[in-house]
């Protein structure tokens, strides 16, 4: 069998059309959703991400502001900028592009953003609300994974979901979202002893470890749904954490890289910004 490919690009385009009409309705009420993005330093990957976020905002009519600060910026200067944006009524969402230079504490920055403008869903208050299943801004990549599964009519309730990876940005929250949808969830990570034994039990396998082609067909149960969140560059080409060619022969559904989860991440950021503007 060959897996059904979950096309994140096509789904993102469809969702963005829906979001565009929501923006139009908000504008009719005199509200233009506004997103502020702060970029500290000039990390090439971060610069690319920030540009694509701005372009996506433009396409659907969200007002976006990019604040570029030098790599030498102090933590105090960055926190002052966040305070200013917290108090700016034209800005509904604030995003600080990670990673930050070493003199700045990421946690201090995340906690300084007003929870009402935390469109990345990283503030401890947002995370806590997600844990107890309350309405909140969900982290964009896990939110994108959830929407992809729902749109593909993949049943989550009662299924065994195995998450490989435990980062605060993807691994931990995506497992929590699956638990909120009534799945049984197992986390694996670098200290997990019997990885293959556990991943082979997964009905839904979500991989986010940042290691190229780390998961191959030997890790996957026949008919499992495999979501590849990784993005790695090997010999100048992008690839995921899953060995696409071998896994597509055993999985029932599989996300490609590029064109899988990636386009959904920015789409959910747009959705969160619109939600913030409504509130």
From Swiss-Prot:
Keyword set, alphabetical order: Amino-acid biosynthesis, Histidine biosynthesis, Hydrolase, Methionine biosynthesis, Multifunctional enzyme, NADP, One-carbon metabolism, Oxidoreductase, Purine biosynthesis
GO BP term (any one): L-histidine biosynthetic process
Substrates-to-products reaction catalysed: (6R)-5,10-methylene-5,6,7,8-tetrahydrofolate + NADP(+) = (6R)-5,10-methenyltetrahydrofolate + NADPH; (6R)-5,10-methenyltetrahydrofolate + H2O = (6R)-10-formyltetrahydrofolate + H(+)
Positions that bind NADP(+): 165-167, 190, 231
Pathway entry: One-carbon metabolism; tetrahydrofolate interconversion
Self-association and partners: Homodimer.
Stated family: Belongs to the tetrahydrofolate dehydrogenase/cyclohydrolase family.
Name assigned to this protein: Bifunctional protein FolD
């Amino acid at each position: 069998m060959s897996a059904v490919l979950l096309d994140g690009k096509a789904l993102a385009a469809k969702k963005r059309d829906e979001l565009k009409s929501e923006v139009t309705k908000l504008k009719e009420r005199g509200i233009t959703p506004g997103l502020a993005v702060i970029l500290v330093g000039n990390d090439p990957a971060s610069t690319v991400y920030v540009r694509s976020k701005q372009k996506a905002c433009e396409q659907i009519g969200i007002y976006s502001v990019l604040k570029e600060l030098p790599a030498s910026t102090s933590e105090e200067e960055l926190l002052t900028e966040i305070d200013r944006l917290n108090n700016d009524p034209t800005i509904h969402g604030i995003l600080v592009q990670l990673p930050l230079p070493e003199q700045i504490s990421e946690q201090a920055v995340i906690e300084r953003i007003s929870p009402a403008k935390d469109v990345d869903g990283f503030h401890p208050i947002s995370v806590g609300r997600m844990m107890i299943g309350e309405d909140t801004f969900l982290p964009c990549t896990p939110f994108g994974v959830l929407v992809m599964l729902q749109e593909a009519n993949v049943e989550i309730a009662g299924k065994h979901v195995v998450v490989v990876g435990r980062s605060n940005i993807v691994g931990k929250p995506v497992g929590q979202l699956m638990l909120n949808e009534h799945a049984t969830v197992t986390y694996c990570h670098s200290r997990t002893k019997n990885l293959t034994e556990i991943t082979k039990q997964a009905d839904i396998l979500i991989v986010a470890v940042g290691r190229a082609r780390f998961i191959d067909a030997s890790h996957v149960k026949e008919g499992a749904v495999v979501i590849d969140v990784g993005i790695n560059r090997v010999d100048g080409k992008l690839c995921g954490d899953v060995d696409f060619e071998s896994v597509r022969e055993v999985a029932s559904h599989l996300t490609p890289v590029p064109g899988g989860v990636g386009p959904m991440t920015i789409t959910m950021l747009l959705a969160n910004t619109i939600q913030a503007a409504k509130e």
